[in-house]
Structures are given as C-alpha cells and as structure tokens.
Amino acid sequence: MSHPEAPITPEVEADLAIARRGCDELLVESEFARKLARSRATGVPLRIKLGLDPTAPDIHLGHTVVLNKMRQLQDLGHNVIFLIGDFTSTIGDPSGRNSTRPPLTREQIETNAKTYYAQASLVLDPARTEIRYNSEWCDPLGARGMIQLASRYTVARMMEREDFTRRFKGGVPIAVHEFLYPLLQGYDSVALKADLELGGTDQKFNLLVGRELQKEYGQEQQCILTMPLLVGTDGVEKMSKSKGNYIGISEAPESMFGKLMSISDTLMWRYYELLSFRSLADIAALKAEIDGGRNPRDAKVALAQEIVARFHSPQAAEAALAAFEARFRDGAIPEDMPEVTVGGAPQGILRILREAGLVASGSEAQRNVEQGGVRVNGDRVEDKSLQLSAGTYVVQVGKRKFARVKLVG
C-alpha cells in the first residue's frame, strides 16, 4: 500500500531520536522515519503495538523498559495499543526455551492480566491507552482459519528461529502447536493494522513474522523496535525473580529505593538510559558533573527518587530518601564496608556469614540468626536455612558488623 512521501523535518528527526534512545534495533529505520513524517504531515497518529502474555502476576523494572518506550511514543501523540495475549498464553511462547512451555489456564490468565494492566498503568497513560485482547480475533478463526493462516508461512522459515534450531539439533521435542505461537502473534499485527511493534530482543523473530504476514495480507508492513533486557541489581545477569536480582514495581518505597542505591555506579548510567524519563541532554550534563568530581551518590539518589515517585508518589520518594539517610546518619549502615566474593550460589546464609568474616563459626552464625541479629539488605533473617541466589547483598550482624557480599555461581 503506497502513501505520499512527507519531508523528514527536524521535528521528525527529534521524534526518531526519542524512538532510538536505548533501543537495540529499529527495523527498518528509514521506513519508520517516513511513517513519522507522514504522521506529522497528516495529523494521523501511528498505531503502536505492544503485546504481553500475562504469564506471571507481577511486573519488575525489567519489564518496564519496553513500557517506558511506549510511554515516550505515547507522549509524542501516537496511539498506543496494550495487547493482552489471553489467547496466545494458552499456547505458551517458546521464545528462548529449551523445552515446551506449559500453557496457562483461562483463570490464571484472567487473574494475571488484571494485575499486569494495573501495574502497566503506572507507566502508560491509561486515558490514552487502547486495551485489546487477542482472543477477539483468534477465537473466531476456528480450525479452517487457523489452517489458512498456517499456509502463509513455511516450516523452513520457522526453523530459522534459533531456539527451534537448537532444540531440533539437540533432539528436544518441538510440538506443532509451538509453530502457531509466532504466527498468531504476527496475526495480531494484521488484526490491529500496527505501524510499529515493540518487544524485547528475545521477541525479534515473532515481530518479524508480523511484518511478513502484513505483507501477505496486503497491508503496509510494520516496523519493529526491540529493547534490550535490563541487567539486574547484581550487574551480571538479566533482571529476574528467579535470580533474586530484581526490583518489583509494587515493592515498598524503602525497599525499592534501597535496591536502587545498591547498584554499581557503572550500572547506574544504563538504568538512567533505560528507566529514566529525563532527557539525554540532562543525563549527559549530570554525567559530566560526576566526571568532574561530584559524588556519584547524588546521581543515584536522583534516579532512585524518580523511580520511586513514578510507582508510588513524590512524597513516598522523599520519605524513602529520609529513611535511607537516617540509617547512615545513625550508624545503621556505613557507606564504606568490606567487600567479599563468595562462590557456589545459591548459598546458605550460615556459610555466607562465615565466608564474609562476620562470625567465627557455624554455631555463632546460627545463634545470631536465631536471636534476630542478622539482616540482608536491611531485612531481618528469620530462617537459618535461607538460600541466597547470585547477586550483591549488604549483610549485617548485630549493630556494627557489615559486609557487601557478592555471591557468584
């Protein structure tokens, strides 16, 4: 489908820079620039799609990277479609899997979807967000429609997908229904007539299928924008609940603030790029000040306050800062403490205490836990069998013994 060309103005270039900020890939960038130019010239907003399968009930900051990008594009005046994959969740996304993902029940999906959107609304503007469910068009397809859809894509193309190839070569079963997942996600773009689809880097194949299917159905092809996976608080692996290196957006303000203050100075700038709504010019100016001798802690406090304020309130952010500073002022947590690396993650708290030099023996470690004298990241340890996964933790025994423990696998 052809459209009249519109000029690439400085305003379009500025919009394109916002889209590119922090992204991994923007395909095809020249096409997207033309879409932006046409939108500015005609006043017709682009249709920007983000699909999420509600496979878990809670969202952490890693999930918000792509939501932040949606909000930035939403603030440019474009139509944002928050697509809940209630139908595709019953299949299970095979992206990045070494085995078949178990499907969810309708009840699980409905429960998770409510929580997902409520939390996503803390980033997106609900008044300007279109919510859709892909069961709207997938349920009516039926067997005939599903077969017709499947006829538009080849097995050879499907096997270009890295995780399918790896499983096939390794003799790991691939169920036929798993081929349907990227097809149905792609068909979502056809049903919604999407101009741009967003996703994580692990979703690139699925997003490209949508682009190809739109061509098959005679539509203008969507562009795709992939966002990187956020590194967790340990600075090593992607943010994940299973790794214990995550910051949940529904966490208490003080906990959220404290975890953000625990990240390294280097990782802080990556968080600024992917999580902050401050302009790149503002961030560059702040970085120049830090490079010029200003305390990096000031920049970290500003980031922590911004994020806590977004998911709670400015008042909660101020209170979290006050509580954090009080702990240092009262000698609760020193700014400087020994740093210890402990291997063998996941590792038990009793051994961690010994390895960190906070206790002299296992019996002393056990006694301190039983007496409530051990804290990890400020939280009292009540279970002597507690296991900690890989990550960085502030471990405290009594009032005066502290160590920053980096737990590695």
Swiss-Prot record:
Domain of life, source organism: Bacteria
Keywords from the named record: Aminoacyl-tRNA synthetase, ATP-binding, Cytoplasm, Ligase, Nucleotide-binding, Protein biosynthesis, RNA-binding
Motif 'KMSKS' region per record, residues: 238-242
Motif ('HIGH' region): 54-63
GO biological process, one term: tyrosyl-tRNA aminoacylation
Localization: Cytoplasm
Disulfide bonds: none
Catalytic activity entry: tRNA(Tyr) + L-tyrosine + ATP = L-tyrosyl-tRNA(Tyr) + AMP + diphosphate + H(+)
InterPro entries according to UniProt: aa-tRNA-synth_I_CS, aa-tRNA-synth_Ic, Rossmann-like_a/b/a_fold, S4_RNA-bd, S4_RNA-bd_sf, SYY-like_C, Tyr-tRNA-ligase, Tyr-tRNA-ligase_bac-type
One cellular component (GO) term of this entry: cytosol
Chief localisation class: cytoplasm
MF terms in GO: ATP binding; RNA binding; tyrosine-tRNA ligase activity
The keyword Zinc appears for this protein: no
Gene3D superfamilies: HUPs, RNA-binding S4 domain, Tyrosyl-Transfer RNA Synthetase
Domain S4 RNA-binding as annotated: residue spans: 347-407
Protein family: Belongs to the class-I aminoacyl-tRNA synthetase family. TyrS type 2 subfamily.
Function in brief: Catalyzes the attachment of tyrosine to tRNA(Tyr) in a two-step reaction: tyrosine is first activated by ATP to form Tyr-AMP and then transferred to the acceptor end of tRNA(Tyr).
Protein name, per record: Tyrosine--tRNA ligase
Protein's gene: tyrS
